[in-house]
Regions:
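Generic short beta-strand
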Residues: 86, 136-139, 149
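Solvent-exposed, polar/charged alpha-helical surfaces in well-ordered, non-transmembrane soluble domains
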Residues: 48, 52, 56, 66, ...
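Small/polar-residue-rich segments within soluble enzyme cores
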Residues: 2-110
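Conserved, well-ordered alpha-helix/loop/beta-strand core segments that scaffold catalytic motifs
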Residues: 96-136
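Short N-terminal helix-loop-first-beta-strand/juxtamembrane motif that initiates sensory/input modules
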Residues: 36-37, 131-143
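Extracellular/periplasmic catalytic domains that process cell-envelope and extracellular macromolecules
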Residues: 44-48, 107, 131-132, 142, ...
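Beta-lactam-recognizing serine transpeptidase/beta-lactamase-like catalytic domain environment
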Residues: 92-93, 97-101, 142-185, 190-295
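Alpha-helix C-terminal capping segments
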Residues: 27-34, 125-133, 195
Length: 295
């Protein structure tokens, strides 16, 4: 048994080497032999775990420690099949002669939790994240419903072997999708919404690939000129210069008000004990400098 057990299992085998009472240990292959019986049980996270940072993980006692495993523990603990190994023992606690342990399965009948994630989109997002970044995240939302279709954080971890990641210097247990970031181009729809509400949608900007505000140069991606763009074209091409000019027309108070209404600067609570970082949204009065506001 020893070569096919985990380190924790090997320690248990050593501790129990002279034990007479039945005990359980996890092994990686069928090693049925005299006095040992193997039973196949489903892995909680499957052979290729997905969305580990969002789902979280369990401790050695089967209690949720992080992510949805912790936030929804009361609900999740009552779902799924429950396996019990029943042994007939004598007065000394030894397995009775001529008997074998019996695996008894029962189903709680509870329905569990269904997420909005798409398995295919999640798997694709995780593959792209691993291939293109050392540290970061990819979020995919359904534009029509705002349902989260993918929530990938990299580097990731194996929820079946969390101990291997506990002291890793790149902090794989952190869900980077829930951290605070400089918003970048994600903020452009906020400016567009504020402009639509204020009736200021007529701005046309001849983009040379950059914009100068108080002597500070703000470039479009790669410094590529977009030419003459209106609001729709600026959104399509993600023109930095256009939205800097639009923000100047709207003013910091109007822009900040729309950002607050759309949820910027506050945490999003997804479940008990599971929230995103709030981030920081500066007060309008701190943006008196045109350069600071543009940034």
């Amino acid at each position: 048994l020893y070569p096919y057990a985990s380190k924790a299992g090997q320690a248990m085998l050593y501790q129990k080497r002279n034990a007479s009472r039945p005990f359980l240990v996890e092994v990686t292959r069928d090693v049925s032999a005299m006095g040992a019986w193997c039973y196949a049980v489903p892995r909680r996270y499957g052979d290729a775990p997905l969305a580990s940072a969002l789902l979280g993980y369990l401790d050695g006692e089967g209690h949720g420690v992080a992510g949805l495993e912790a936030a929804l523990e009361d609900l999740l603990s009552g779902t799924g099949a429950q396996d019990k190994l029943v042994c007939a023992v004598n007065a000394q606690g030894k397995l009775r002669s001529g008997t074998e342990p019996e695996l008894v399965k029962s189903d709680s009948g509870a329905v569990g939790v269904q997420l909005t994630l798409s398995r295919s989109i999640q798997r694709a997002a995780e593959a792209v994240a691993v291939q293109t970044m050392q540290s970061g995240c990819i979020l995919v939302l359904d534009a029509a419903s705002a349902k989260v279709r993918a929530c990938a954080s990299t580097p990731g971890f194996d929820p079946e072997n969390v101990s291997a990641s506990l002291n890793a210097p790149d902090s794989p247990l952190v869900n980077r999708a829930f951290q605070a970031y400089a918003v970048g181009s994600v903020f452009k729809p906020v400016l567009a919404a504020a402009a639509l509400e204020a009736g200021k949608t007529g701005l046309v900007w001849d983009c040379p690939g950059y914009c100068v505000v108080d002597g500070q140069v703000f470039r479009c991606a790669g410094g590529v000129p977009h030419g003459e763009v209106d609001l729709a074209a600026a959104l399509q091409k993600s023109c930095n210069g256009y939205f800097i000019r639009l923000g100047q027309e709207l003013g910091p108070e109007r822009v900040r008000e729309m950002a607050v209404r759309l949820g910027f600067g506050r945490a999003l609570n997804l479940a008990d004990t599971l929230s995103t970082a709030a981030g920081q949204l500066p007060e309008a009065e701190t943006l008196t400098s045109s350069g600071a506001f543009a940034n």
